[in-house]
Amino acid sequence: MQKLKLHGFNNLTKSLSFCIYDICYAKTADDRDGYITYIDEQYNANRLTEILSETCSMIGANILNIARQDYEPQGASVTILVSEEPVDPGSIDTSEHPGPLPESVVAHLDKSHICVHTYPESHPEGGLCTFRADIEVSTCGVISPLKALNYLIHQLESDIVTMDYRVRGFTRDINGVKHYIDHEINSIQNFMSKDMKALYHMMDVNVYQENIFHTKIMLKDFDLKHYLFNARPDDLSAEERKAITDLLYKEMQEIYYGRNLPVL
């Protein structure tokens, strides 16, 4: 897409939001409590602040304010307001390709924010535990928040991720013509690295005429040892391993497709 010559500031708002899920099996009530405690410490407000601050540093954004909070009995939230320095729009790469990992990258944001909220949960029946992190990166300017997608998913390795990207509003060029998007995009998948795509099943639901893009991903490979908390597969009988595997797989399928499946 040819770069636009704008009249004034780029008024398009670009928002990327995604839910990251981690699934676990904890057999006893003590194990479930232990998982919640572990995940709450692993993703507390301080750790999340470090991740989001590194995101800002990686893309060259200036942090204006940080608000963070840990909650009782569990969960945390962090919101960072950021702004940009003057930048030449001609130097900004808006092509459709995977975003960077933490390397030498320059980008700028204005009137923008990055926020994350965490939701650990478990149920007393069945032994299933889930951890959900909701992340939103919203920018107003020439930069797409999709550039941060690749890094954030690498930082928060998870079983299932649902992503939504939307461009809102319009901006005018020097001739007064309104533009409702300023970069080419066919799929969020095109902003993900090859190694990440190799790990996940992927599905798109896009509404191109509304500039709304939705992608779901779920890990391809299932290894039971990665889903047991405070236990090993060798500690379980073959029947127990199969029952737990079926339970976890059903849970992941339901979250991925967003609907409850019948009990077989």
From Swiss-Prot:
Pathway annotation: Amine and polyamine biosynthesis; S-adenosylmethioninamine biosynthesis; S-adenosylmethioninamine from S-adenosyl-L-methionine: step 1/1
Going by the record, the broad EC class of this enzyme is: lyase
The record places the site described as Cleavage (non-hydrolytic) at: K111, S112
According to the UniProt entry, its GO molecular function terms are: adenosylmethionine decarboxylase activity
Record-linked Pfam families:
AdoMet_dc
Its required cofactor(s), as named, are:
pyruvate
Give the record's family classification.
Belongs to the prokaryotic AdoMetDC family. Type 2 subfamily.
NCBIfam families assigned: SAM_DCase_Eco
Show the HAMAP family listed in the entry: AdoMetDC_2 (MF_00465)
Report the protein name in the record: S-adenosylmethionine decarboxylase proenzyme
Q: Which organism is it from?
A: Sodalis glossinidius (strain morsitans)
